[in-house]
Amino acid sequence: MAQSSLAQTTEELDKRNGFKDIKLATEVHQYEGLEYKEEIADELFKTLSVYVKKKGYYESIGSIKIHDVEVLAYKGEVYQIKVITEKNPKLYRGLKKAFGEPTFSPRGDNYYWSTDNLGLTFGNNAKSKLQLLYTSYVMKGRLKEDKKEEIEDISEDF
């Protein structure tokens, strides 16, 4: 008799496309639980907008306390979501149940799940905290298109 696995696959990661109601590659202004903090310089994107969670929003993942949520946006769209939580082994078990077995990266000393559209890394953040980092590969693709257009504009301006 074959047993069915309760563990999901990375298809579930694609389906969720982000953290809670914050979805990657969507307009950042639609999330009332986020507020603008600042613009930062970025090696890849040149400039990114930083948004942080408002008080009373994104307080926990089940019983696990969330310390911080930071969202990076490129041209108003969500590129990356960073979630900092208290250290709790239940978080890793929950991620495995939701998205399947991760790959371990000894170089980054973290675990990751990856699809064609996004990646999720999980690891330590300081001694007593954990970090989830969702990154949109779709937004990286848009950046490449923007850079091609910029080069095209420059080449036509001679």
Cite the ranges covered by each PLM segment.
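Bacterial Sec-dependent N-terminal signal peptides
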Residues: 1-8
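Non-cytosolic coordination micro-motifs
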Residues: 8-51, 80-158
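Mid-chain, structured segments of secreted extracytoplasmic proteins
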Residues: 50-91
